[in-house]
């Protein structure tokens, strides 16, 4: 015979019983109150059943009965209880342990109330930790000078794409990652060495080392890791020549150029060499550096530095002077403008050389000529205005000099923005006009078999 136990919970008392066929009451039921609102039926352990009824048989598949909320009225004997249970109870699988003999349901874990203030403080602490990690990561990214690093990387990639020799995806990926890391390492060392000087310039006051987000020692450690990994990737994934160029660029920019910035105006020419090395790295990844096309690309990047930087430094020349940087913009303003124009004009023969040495087609001269002319126009206006400003007629007239200087500032800004767009335009056009780039469009029409 199957035996199940029934526990009825009331506001006054309780009763234990066995239901189904041969129902037998184990405990007293007379104390059940009429206002019972909840009935819970549980299977009791074998020991509990035997304590009250030695002949009872333990049910190995216990069932939990959960009552509805309807009240039980007029319960007076065993039969009444049995009938009421049949009418009001439904059966569900027991989710409790079959050895349970507790009369009250319980949770298998301790419930501890959490104070609202403590919870808010914990949430604030977690958010603060997350914010600190984010700020630290942003600071290290800023150490690499992301915009400058991207420009360096793109110049290497464009040079690699213009190489007449076949390229591979693996080699391109290693070149991209390695060049990016080497550039980031050089910039991090530069920032680590100049916090006292950068603090005096509005343009550089927000750098991470200046505001204390990263210490100089941390910047140097970061640069060492980036530089080591970058040169290793270039050495193993590309070739030793590219790795040597990457390492030399780190030393040239972070030590020689950075030191010369406070000693002599020649630092600008040294810095231009730094910009010319990435195209050589891209070319050397797939082709020998004996090809004259590689030096045309390097010369293009070298010449571009002067109209770009000289016009930029012109408008912040006083900041450079106050910070102790020796720049042509304030040491010799007329020379600064003349050099910007001179190297803008040099773009024409360098672009011509790309077509002459079969790197691009001859149509490239039309496109690049328009872009070069646009840059030269603003560089020329900048130079002519500065030449007028420092003439004997204007230089000694304070009012006219200030008016002329304001005009020169406008031309310098326009020349600077022209240079920002000039370099990507010239490189992209070179890729589009690469020699034999579009021959596949005419292959079918030139094939006599298909005519």
UniProtKB/Swiss-Prot annotation:
The chain crosses the membrane at residues 149-169, 240-260, 265-285, 289-309, 339-359, 414-434. One of its GO terms (molecular function) is protoheme IX farnesyltransferase activity. Its main location: mitochondrion. The keyword DNA-binding does not apply. It is found in: Mitochondrion membrane. It is a multi-pass membrane protein. Converts protoheme IX and farnesyl diphosphate to heme O. Belongs to the UbiA prenyltransferase family. This is Protoheme IX farnesyltransferase, mitochondrial. It comes from Candida glabrata (strain ATCC 2001 / BCRC 20586 / JCM 3761 / NBRC 0622 / NRRL Y-65 / CBS 138) (Yeast). The lineage of its organism: Eukaryota, Fungi, Dikarya, Ascomycota, Saccharomycotina. The gene is COX10.
């Amino acid at each position: 015979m199957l035996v199940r136990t029934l526990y009825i919970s009331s506001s006054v008392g309780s009763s234990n019983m066995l239901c189904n066929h041969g129902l037998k009451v184990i405990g007293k039921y007379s104390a059940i109150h009429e206002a019972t609102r909840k009935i819970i039926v549980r299977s009791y352990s074998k020991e509990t059943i035997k304590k009250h009824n030695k002949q009872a048989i333990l049910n190995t598949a216990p069932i939990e009965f959960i009552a509805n909320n309807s009240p039980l009225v007029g319960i007076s004997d065993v039969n009444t209880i049995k009938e009421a249970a049949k009418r009001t109870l439904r059966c569900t699988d027991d989710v409790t342990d079959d050895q349970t003999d507790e009369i009250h349901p319980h949770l298998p874990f301790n419930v501890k109330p959490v104070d609202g203030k403590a919870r808010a403080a914990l949430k604030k602490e977690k958010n603060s930790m997350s914010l600190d990690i984010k700020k630290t990561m942003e600071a290290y990214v800023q150490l690499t000078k992301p915009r400058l690093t991207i420009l360096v990387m793109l110049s290497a990639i464009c040079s690699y794409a213009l190489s007449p020799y076949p390229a591979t995806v693996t080699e391109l990926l290693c070149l991209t990652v390695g060049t990016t890391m080497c550039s980031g390492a050089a910039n991090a060392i530069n920032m680590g060495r100049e916090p006292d000087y950068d603090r005096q310039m509005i343009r550089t006051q927000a750098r991470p080392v200046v505001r204390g987000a990263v210490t100089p020692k941390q910047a140097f450690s970061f640069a060492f890791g980036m530089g080591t990994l970058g040169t290793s990737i270039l050495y193993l994934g590309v070739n030793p020549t590219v790795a040597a160029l990457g390492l030399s660029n780190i030393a040239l920019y972070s030590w020689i150029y950075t030191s010369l910035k406070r000693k002599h105006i020649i630092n600008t020419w040294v810095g231009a060499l730094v910009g010319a090395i990435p195209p050589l790295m891209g070319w050397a990844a797939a082709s020998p550096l004996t090809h004259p096309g590689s030096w045309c690309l390097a010369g293009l990047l070298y010449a571009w530095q002067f109209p770009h930087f000289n016009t930029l430094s012109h408008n912040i020349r006083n900041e450079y002077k106050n910070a102790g940087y020796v720049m042509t913009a304030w040491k010799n303003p007329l020379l600064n403008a003349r050099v910007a124009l001179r190297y803008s004009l040099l773009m024409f023969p360098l672009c011509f050389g790309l077509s002459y040495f079969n790197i691009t087609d001859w149509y490239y001269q039309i496109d690049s000529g328009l872009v070069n002319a646009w840059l030269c126009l603003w560089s020329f206006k900048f130079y002519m205005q500065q030449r007028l400003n420092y003439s004997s007629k204007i230089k000694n007239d304070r009012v006219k000099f200030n008016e002329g200087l304001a005009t020169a500032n406008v031309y310098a800004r326009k020349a600077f923005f022209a240079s920002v767009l000039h370099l990507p335009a010239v490189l992209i056009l070179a890729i589009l006009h690469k020699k034999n780039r579009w021959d596949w469009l005419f292959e079918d029409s030139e094939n006599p078999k298909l005519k």
